[in-house]
Amino acid sequence: MVEFSTYESSSCTVWSSLFISGTGQKEYHLIMRPDCGGGFPEQYFALRKALGEFIEGEGSVRPIFMRWFLSDASNQLALVEDEDCAVSFIEQPPLDGTKVAL
């Protein structure tokens, strides 16, 4: 079974796909983009906040893999926090003109 939903925080949009196996195991795939203006720090921390809110709202879920899309990786990586999961960084600016997407 697959469920699709959209979550809007005050500064981000989150598109969620929930896959539920026959045994009840859940797997989420999220696409997140900031809706706020400003530079990379504001947009990055808005995404972090929205991710935290999503995880808190869903209960016992945790990230397994994150793929960050950065507009200027060489200058932005210093601000990115360490994660407790596998992470990849793609230096490809999001098409909507933002500085970062997840």
For each feature predicted by the language model, list its residue ranges.
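Short, polar/acidic, helix-capping and beta-turn segments at strand->helix junctions
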Residues: 1-101
